[in-house]
A protein has these predicted regions:
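Single conserved hydrophobic/aromatic residue that forms the stacking wall/gate
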Residues: 1-17, 21
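TM-adjacent membrane-interface loops and short helices in multi-pass inner/ER membrane proteins
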Residues: 113, 117-161, 172-176
Length: 273
């Protein structure tokens, strides 16, 4: 993991160890035995908490939150007693003030602007203001492909990355947004259904964790570009520019499709028998 320095990149795409790890973290429960007791789940929890803390110190709050929530969802799906899940959640909520108190100056600025973007309209609040204008101006049918004023005239920063969805909503409008979210919903639904019908416990938990990961990506990015939460740098799946993020997400969906295929092969064998 890269600590306290930006991730290395190439001219073709950016690559960050944390991007790869947040997809790998749903395998952390692999070392846990099939037990609801806490002592059998200590190793997976350690494999989630330590990297989350290190990534938080990069600082990369968005990625740390993704790894932490998605990793613990995997432990939860593995059958840990609910009381331990509630206990762990309570510790997280109690530690929120500590995390806020140790935020970097630019992160605190984002938090302040979140409550009042007009407080710094040409600084920290500029991104969210332009994003809202882009989304609102798209209307029902949008302005047309490559015809968005906020994106094409470069009013909207990071339009190829975290705010890619705002660009698409400006160009395609509410109708295009409905189509995009329908595809995302279908991917989540397929992942959850595969989790239910998977042949192995490992595949079941992994597919459920992938569904949680997709939901977190979509929810956080949508809330971010609409001003419901502060900007934390979480891209929209499959649409935002990126190297390792796109590859690892595709690998995750490939895992889901393979688990589903194995289940179909088993059913075909039963029918032919």
């Amino acid at each position: 993991l890269m600590i306290r320095r930006p991730p290395r990149s190439t001219p073709l795409y950016s690559s960050a160890a944390s991007d790869v790890y947040k997809r790998q973290s749903y395998y952390s429960f692999f070392g846990a035995k099939k037990s609801k007791k806490l002592r059998f789940n200590i190793l997976p929890i350690i494999l989630i908490v330590i990297p989350s803390f290190l990534i938080l110190n990069q600082p990369d709050l968005g990625t740390a939150v993704l790894i932490f929530i998605m990793g613990f969802s995997a432990v939860f799906f593995s059958g840990l007693y609910l009381k331990w899940v509630v206990f762990g959640s309570s510790i997280v909520f109690i530690s929120i003030p500590v995390v806020i108190a140790n935020l970097k100056p630019y992160q605190m600025k984002r938090l302040e602007v979140f409550f009042d973007p007009d407080k710094d309209p040409f600084g920290s609040g500029y991104h969210i203001i332009q994003s809202k204008i882009a989304i609102g101006s798209g209307g029902l049918t949008g302005k047309g492909f490559m015809s968005g004023t906020q994106s094409q005239l470069n009013f909207l920063p990071e339009k190829h990355n975290d705010f890619m969805l705002a660009v698409l909503l400006e160009e395609t409008g509410l109708i295009g947004g409905f189509f995009i979210f329908s595809i995302f919903f279908y991917l989540i639904l397929i992942s959850m259904h595969t989790s239910i019908v998977a042949r192995s416990r490992f595949s079941s938990i992994a597919c459920a964790s992938i569904a949680v990961l997709l939901f977190l990506y979509i929810f956080i990015n949508c809330a971010m570009i609409t001003g419901l939460i502060p900007i934390v740098g979480v891209p929209i799946p499959m649409l935002s520019y990126g190297g390792s993020a796109v590859i690892s997400l595709c690998a995750a969906m490939g895992f889901v499709l393979n688990a589903r295929r194995q289940r179909d092969i088993k059913l075909e064998g039963i029918i032919n028998a």
